[in-house]
UniProtKB/Swiss-Prot annotation:
Function in brief: Assembly factor required for Rieske Fe-S protein RIP1 incorporation into the cytochrome b-c1 (CIII) complex. Functions as a chaperone, binding to this subunit within the mitochondrial matrix and stabilizing it prior to its translocation and insertion into the late CIII dimeric intermediate within the mitochondrial inner membrane. Modulates the mitochondrial matrix zinc pool.
Keywords recorded for this protein, A-Z: Chaperone, Mitochondrion, Transit peptide
Official protein name in the record: Mitochondrial zinc maintenance protein 1, mitochondrial
GO cellular component: mitochondrial matrix
Chain residue ranges for the region called Disordered: 95-115
Top-level division of the source organism's lineage: Eukaryota
UniProt keyword Transmembrane helix present: no
FT transit peptide: 1-36
InterPro entries in UniProt: Complex1_LYR_LYRM7 (IPR045298), MZM1/LYRM7 (IPR050435)
GO MF term set: protein folding chaperone
The organism's taxonomic lineage, starting at the top: Eukaryota, Fungi, Dikarya, Ascomycota, Pezizomycotina
Amino acid sequence: MASQTAVSARSAYRQILRATRIAFQDDFRVLVAARQEARRQFDEHRREGIDTPMQINHAKEVATILRHNIVQGVRDSKDENAKWELRIHDDIERGDNDSIRVGGKKVKVDKPCSA
């Protein structure tokens, strides 16, 4: 039976893979690079150590940032004057200017971009 640490590490790794799929959808080159880096980091820290829980927590935070804060822009590569289109998906964190004024506090935004 696997240890709780191993289960947590696998869960964090799967979270990163899911987050990269969402964040880098339609950008195969970046998707592959992000997944290779995640694999490299997990392989590098394969042996359990004192800082393993911190590394697992870091991986979960990376997955959260990828899922909620990374927005990719695309434009027609043939037209230099083409406008950038942002690929904003349902998981992207949306805020308003009032949230900037709330220093040091967590702001929960529960409205879609179109509201």
